[in-house]
Amino acid sequence: PNIIHSNTLAENITDIQESDRKDVVLANPPFGGKEQTQIQQNFPISTGETAYLFLQHFIKMLKVGGRCGVVIKNTFLSNTDNASVALRKQLLEECSLHTILDLPGGAFTGTGVKTVVLFFEKGRATEKVWYYQLDVGRNMGKTNPLNDKDMADFIECQKTSALTDNSWIVDVGTVNKDTWD
């Protein structure tokens, strides 16, 4: 295998060429970290939040028509700082954010952080987002992890973007263009 050990964020994303782009990106980037100013300068949307820098990198790395699934803190959807607003705007304008899976706290062992999984395709603006709030009916944790049964309803419903008690459609036309939430 071709394994390169480096800090992806240290690369200026303007240097990414068409030949570097990928069809699929699946990621659970670190969040809560803070990057130094010299790293932030590699990105058009300057922020110290590691996960937001990775999200910019993923968008840039995708080919047109490329797909991404990325885990990120749920606060990304509502934070009002400049970087969060600008990144949501970029995501909604450059990609079709077709699905948001809202996971329960504790879905990832060792952290109680609430997360969402963003599923998007690069190359066309978002019109509608199917939002699914996963309710497993129990506390999650190391001895009670997320399992296939917990995910079964989501997997079935996402095939048709079914509307249920746990899922709904958000029309991007109703999104506040000042905050992009």
Residue positions per predicted region:
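A conserved structural/catalytic subdomain of Rossmann-like adenosyl-cofactor enzymes
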Residues: 5-181
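Phosphate/diphosphate-binding loops
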Residues: 2
